[in-house]
Structures are given as C-alpha cells and as structure tokens.
Amino acid sequence: MTPSTEALPTAVKAQVLAEALPWLKQLHGKIVVIKYGGNAMTDDTLRRAFAADMAFLRNCGIHPVVVHGGGPQITAMLRRLGIPGDFKGGFRVTTPEVLDVARMVLFGQVGRELVNLINAHGPYAVGITGEDAQLFTAVRRSVTVDGVTTDIGLVGDVERVNAAAVLDLIAARRIPVVSTLAPDAEGVVHNINADTAAAALAEALGAEKLLMLTDVEGLYTSWPNRDSLVSEIDTATLSQLLPTLEAGMIPKVEACLRAVSAGVPSAHVIDGRVEHCVLVELFTDEGTGTKVVSS
C-alpha cells in the first residue's frame, strides 16, 4: 500500500533515525573535534543549527570539541577602530595592537556567542583559549612571499598541546569551545590558525574524527570542475593534489593530512552552508562533503 502524503514525513523521519543507529553506536563515548568557521559562523540560522548539533552530540554520549577562528569578525572590528590591517602569504600581519583586537573578538565575541547558543539547550558549553591551563604552547612562524622569508608578527603554530586541559572538561560532560590564542615559551601570546589548532588538538585528544566546516560542498580535485567533487580520498592521493588546490583550501587540507597521519581515523571537509551539516555527515549513509582516510 502506498503511504499517504500525511504519513510520508513520519516514515521518512523514522528511516533517518534508523539509519543513524549504527553511527551513534560507533561514536558513543568518542571525541569529535569540529573546526567551526565560514558561513556557519556568520549566518544566524546556521549558527543556531550548529549549536543544536553540538547539544545533540553531547546528549547522545559523544564528546564534541569546537575550535573556532574569527577572521571576518577581526577584520570588521579593525575597520571600526581604524586600525590598518595587512595580509602576507595568506596570513594576517599581527602587530601587538592587532593581537589585542583579535583576543577581544575571538574570546569576547565569537566564542561567547557560540557558548551562549549552545547553552540555550542546557548548561553544556565552556569557552576557553589556548592560554588557559597551558592548553596550547605556540612557536612563532613566518611565511614565504615570492621566495623570501617574511615576518608576519605575532602569528604562531602549535608546538605543544596540554590535552588534560580539555579532557577535564569532557570528563565533566562539558563542550569545550576553544579560541585559538596561545602563548609561546616566554609567555608572549600569538594568534594561531584555527585549522592548524584543530588538527593539533584532534591528534592530542585521540579524536575519532576531525570535521572542517567550509563554504564549499567538499574537496574538488580539479576546481572549478563541479564533477571533480570526491566523497572519499586517501592521504597519499591528497598529498599529491595539495599543490594544485585553491589557496583557501590548502590550510584545511593540510590540517586533515596532519590529523589522519597522526592517527585520527578520519577527517572530513564538509559544507557548513547546509543546516545541521554535522549531523548529516556523522549520522547518514551518504554524508556531506569529503572524507579523508589513511592510505
């Protein structure tokens, strides 16, 4: 008998729930690190959907850890304050004055807003930075521009991770929301690329998955050819493709390669423009975006 139009939505919902069961069992008790950025961080509907996804994971016995950046928000605040901003080699040149703004925006605005959205579902989220409990130790980095090593100020890479700072929050059934600021060995605070920080944290926590939210459908092996979108790729193939990728995708792909090469079972580049993209990727057979696995 053909289901009636009224009965169909209920049947579809039941099918989706049944499809999610094996994935829920697989991920129960596991840590999933999510790099939060792009449109998912600026569109109100997507922000609320993402926050609901985090609460859903927590209530299913999965341990989400959110790492966020805030480039567009930092740029907007610098403009409002009349502070000049410059980029070299794809990185923001970070003077002490720019760093003060970055700290204010990352932890005081972007992180606070996400914590509040998640906590609308219950007392779950706790905002921290890489400065707290020595979560991250940074080492200053430079970039190469036209073959010349170039200083970009207070910009760092993650040198060490104190996983206990986050594991203690997970043990208390909290959702850590991490702003990517970190001191170096001398205590000088640096701004850290959020993609890099997410990969380092996933590795240190022994995460089951690393999810990278982007503003594209996934990884294209020959952009702008839409037919080149791949649903799964191994690290060897992806490493060969890396030099040919669009500049904006390279830090995300490097983060995926780092995490999977360090033992994280899979990393996922997913479309953050899709409502509840995290749930779609984790709990449906088709998923969304591109899965990176070990060779």
Curated annotation (Swiss-Prot):
Main location: cytoplasm
Enzyme class, broadest EC rank: transferase
GO MF, one annotated term: acetylglutamate kinase activity
Subcellular location: Cytoplasm
UniProt signal peptide: none
Residue(s) at site: Transition state stabilizer: 35, 252
Binding-site residues, substrate: 70-71, 92, 191
InterPro entries (alphabetical): AceGlu_kinase-like_sf, AcgluKinase_fam, ArgB, Asp/Glu/Uridylate_kinase, Glu/AcGlu_kinase, NAGK-C
Recorded superkingdom: Bacteria
Pfam families named in the record: AA_kinase
Associated pathway: Amino-acid biosynthesis; L-arginine biosynthesis; N(2)-acetyl-L-ornithine from L-glutamate: step 2/4
Keywords per UniProt: Amino-acid biosynthesis, Arginine biosynthesis, ATP-binding, Cytoplasm, Kinase, Nucleotide-binding, Transferase
GO biological process: arginine biosynthetic process via ornithine; L-arginine biosynthetic process
UniProt GO cellular component terms: cytoplasm
Function: Catalyzes the ATP-dependent phosphorylation of N-acetyl-L-glutamate.
Family from the record: Belongs to the acetylglutamate kinase family. ArgB subfamily.
Family annotation (HAMAP family): ArgB
Protein name: Acetylglutamate kinase
